């Protein structure tokens, strides 16, 4: 068995699941992704911060995306508006393949991580204040200058995974892990030992005029759930994405059908 397939994940991008070990996703992630996404106001509250980015980056649409100005020999980063120290959080990064260049790094950072340097580099993950995945090279960076950085996910045959335009970042501050998912498949923890910090969504980029979007998908706190809530998760899991449209045909009261569909 390969990585964990997520309910609600897109299957448009195939992943070589047989190459990687069996890695279970964080508790509550499937539930988080099955729930209705936050509204536009919440998206902007969790979006890119125009006051916390490189001077070569312009944040647009209230934080929904940024554009990097075409400045030579500069690596530029941006941080999200909200930092997370508790709970499970997930957000989607959209970054066109043709706009990545030599160093396109996605991850998290503390408020102290630098957001600009005067050369091309994997800025995110270059010191102790940030953690990042170079989605072009497939390398993980933390306190790293590049050489010897581990590959992610760690394939058994040395094959590098092609990262599509959209990927999920999964930050579990209850367990202290950071991981990623693509094509509806969770790839496993990339980093551990993150408890006790406040971490912000972050990226660093080198491509002139690249546009990087962020879409916050929600939060789940570690707390007991009601039997009704757990029953809904069980029913949705057994139906699967392809059969959720058949809820209306189930022998259930209308109110229960609406509850199953988060309506």
UniProtKB/Swiss-Prot annotation:
<dbReference type="InterPro" id="IPR003877">
    <property type="entry name" value="SPRY_dom"/>
</dbReference>
<dbReference type="GO" id="GO:0019005">
    <property type="term" value="C:SCF ubiquitin ligase complex"/>
</dbReference>
<dbReference type="InterPro" id="IPR037340">
    <property type="entry name" value="SSB2_SOCS"/>
</dbReference>
<feature type="domain" description="B30.2/SPRY">
    <location>
        <begin position="26"/>
        <end position="221"/>
    </location>
</feature>
<dbReference type="InterPro" id="IPR036036">
    <property type="entry name" value="SOCS_box-like_dom_sf"/>
</dbReference>
<dbReference type="InterPro" id="IPR001496">
    <property type="entry name" value="SOCS_box"/>
</dbReference>
<keyword id="KW-0963">Cytoplasm</keyword>
<comment type="pathway">
    <text>Protein modification; protein ubiquitination.</text>
</comment>
<comment type="subunit">
    <text>(Microbial infection) Interacts (via C-terminus) with HCV envelope glycoprotein E1. Interacts (via C-terminus) with HCV non-structural protein 5A; this interaction targets NS5A for ubiquitination and degradation.</text>
</comment>
<dbReference type="Pfam" id="PF00622">
    <property type="entry name" value="SPRY"/>
</dbReference>
<dbReference type="InterPro" id="IPR001870">
    <property type="entry name" value="B30.2/SPRY"/>
</dbReference>
<dbReference type="Pfam" id="PF07525">
    <property type="entry name" value="SOCS_box"/>
</dbReference>
<dbReference type="InterPro" id="IPR050672">
    <property type="entry name" value="FBXO45-Fsn/SPSB_families"/>
</dbReference>
<feature type="region of interest" description="Disordered">
    <location>
        <begin position="1"/>
        <end position="48"/>
    </location>
</feature>
<feature type="compositionally biased region" description="Polar residues">
    <location>
        <begin position="1"/>
        <end position="16"/>
    </location>
</feature>
<comment type="similarity">
    <text>Belongs to the SPSB family.</text>
</comment>
<dbReference type="GO" id="GO:0005829">
    <property type="term" value="C:cytosol"/>
</dbReference>
<dbReference type="GO" id="GO:0035556">
    <property type="term" value="P:intracellular signal transduction"/>
</dbReference>
<dbReference type="InterPro" id="IPR043136">
    <property type="entry name" value="B30.2/SPRY_sf"/>
</dbReference>
<dbReference type="InterPro" id="IPR013320">
    <property type="entry name" value="ConA-like_dom_sf"/>
</dbReference>
<dbReference type="GO" id="GO:0006511">
    <property type="term" value="P:ubiquitin-dependent protein catabolic process"/>
</dbReference>
<comment type="subunit">
    <text>Component of the probable ECS(SPSB2) E3 ubiquitin-protein ligase complex which contains CUL5, RNF7/RBX2, Elongin BC complex and SPSB2. Interacts with CUL5, RNF7, ELOB and ELOC. Interacts with MET. Interacts (via B30.2/SPRY domain) with PAWR; this interaction occurs in association with the Elongin BC complex. Interacts with NOS2.</text>
</comment>
<dbReference type="GO" id="GO:0016567">
    <property type="term" value="P:protein ubiquitination"/>
</dbReference>
<dbReference type="GO" id="GO:0043161">
    <property type="term" value="P:proteasome-mediated ubiquitin-dependent protein catabolic process"/>
</dbReference>
<protein>
    <recommendedName>
        <fullName>SPRY domain-containing SOCS box protein 2</fullName>
    </recommendedName>
</protein>
<keyword id="KW-0945">Host-virus interaction</keyword>
<dbReference type="GO" id="GO:1990756">
    <property type="term" value="F:ubiquitin-like ligase-substrate adaptor activity"/>
</dbReference>
<keyword id="KW-0833">Ubl conjugation pathway</keyword>
<comment type="function">
    <text>Substrate recognition component of a SCF-like ECS (Elongin BC-CUL2/5-SOCS-box protein) E3 ubiquitin-protein ligase complex which mediates the ubiquitination and subsequent proteasomal degradation of target proteins. Negatively regulates nitric oxide (NO) production and limits cellular toxicity in activated macrophages by mediating the ubiquitination and proteasomal degradation of NOS2. Acts as a bridge which links NOS2 with the ECS E3 ubiquitin ligase complex components ELOC and CUL5.</text>
</comment>
<feature type="domain" description="SOCS box">
    <location>
        <begin position="222"/>
        <end position="263"/>
    </location>
</feature>
